A protein has these predicted regions:
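C-terminal helix-and-tail extensions that cap enzymatic domains
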Residues: 5-149
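GGW-centered surface loops in extracellular recognition modules
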Residues: 2
Length: 149
């Protein structure tokens, strides 16, 4: 078996790697399930990311960086749906049929830089930049990713 215990047990028992993590969600992650939105369950993924990073901190683990992608993609009313951040993260906006603005390309560049820095160093901030802080109990910081107005 690949997984020998449940996710919650793995975290609380320290059975996960002690590495920095980057995790997040989109503003409309469950937009395809309006009944969940009506019940107020749409924040569960967002809150889960924060709770996970706080659990890591409690165990004395390396930091977790949390993001919240809020860019409502143009072209219809789907909003910032599940996986919509991937076009930005991987610089593949041209593969989407949706209209884009200069702000979309700037956001994509920023996200590619952040993810590249994280893969190289375990920290999404470029040298001399420190705007993306780890999510901690004292400062449950979440980096909001959207086009600049």
């Amino acid at each position: 078996h690949l997984l020998t215990c449940g996710y919650n047990d793995a975290v609380t028992e320290g059975k996960i790697k002690d590495i920095p993590y980057m995790l997040g969600s989109t503003a409309d992650d469950i937009g395809v399930f309006p009944e969940m939105k009506e019940k107020g369950e749409h924040g569960g993924i967002y809150k889960g990311c924060i709770n996970w990073s706080l659990a890591l901190e409690k165990l004395g683990r390396k930091p977790a960086y949390v993001y919240y992608f809020t860019r409502a993609l143009l072209g219809d009313d789907a909003g910032a749906f599940h996986s919509s951040e991937l076009w930005y993260m991987f610089g593949t906006l041209g593969r989407s049929w949706r209209p884009k603005t200069e702000g979309d390309y700037a956001l994509s560049k920023e996200m590619m830089d952040d993810w590249t820095n994280f893969m190289k160093t375990g920290n999404p901030n470029a040298e001399g930049k420190d705007d993306w802080k780890p999510c901690t109990k004292d400062d449950p910081y979440v980096q909001v990713l959207d086009v600049r107005k």
